[in-house]
Regions:
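Low-complexity, Ser/Thr/Pro/Gly-rich disordered linker/stalk regions
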Residues: 1-171
Length: 171
């Protein structure tokens, strides 16, 4: 879809004080309207990275239990022959709750998926997320996630697809 001011825009950050800015993403609940995102350039090899974002779920957000969860942030690796369809890591919302979703392993064979519920969404309140990932298809992988300064995920082990043919840090 074409980038338009209705889909993505820099705006004054609600409730964060004068001069504070935010990027507003809008995705209409309509057929063929499912994504609005920023992506980073891919990097060869698996890397250790830190990411941070503040997220505001508006007061008027509608949770639709008939739909899948809404992914708020995701990290995808470059797909290879197995064409993985699930992100290696996603922070999502559904049924009024936050979730961390992970997928790794062999996308053409034994894929491992986990879902962790992180508690209720507070509409109209900013949530600060910090993600520390040492991306790896083996036991050297690390995933730590903080929500508003509290560590909510602390895992070691595989966290990327290890057999896609090319190693890329998820973006």
């Amino acid at each position: 879809a074409k980038v338009t001011p209705e889909r993505i825009a820099v705006v004054d950050a609600p409730g964060l004080g004068a001069g504070r800015k935010a990027v507003r993403f809008v995705v209409e609940r309509a057929p063929n309207s499912f994504r609005s995102e920023i992506s980073l350039p891919h990097e060869a090899g698996f890397r250790e990275r830190w990411y941070a974002a503040r997220v505001l779920v508006p007061e008027d957000w509608v949770f639709d239990p008939a739909r899948a969860r809404d992914i708020v942030m995701q990290w995808h690796a470059i797909p290879g022959n197995g064409r993985p369809t699930n992100p290696n890591l996603a922070i999502s919302i559904g049924n009024e709750h936050w979730y961390v979703e992970q997928a790794h392993g062999d996308p053409a064979g034994k894929k491992v998926r986990t879902n962790t519920e992180l508690g209720p969404v507070k509409r109209g309140a900013w949530v600060s997320w910090v993600v520390h990932a040492k991306w790896s298809p083996d036991e050297s992988g690390v995933l730590q996630i903080w929500r508003d300064g509290d560590r909510v995920v602390d895992r070691t082990g595989p966290n990327v697809y290890g057999t896609i043919g090319v190693e890329y840090t998820p973006y």
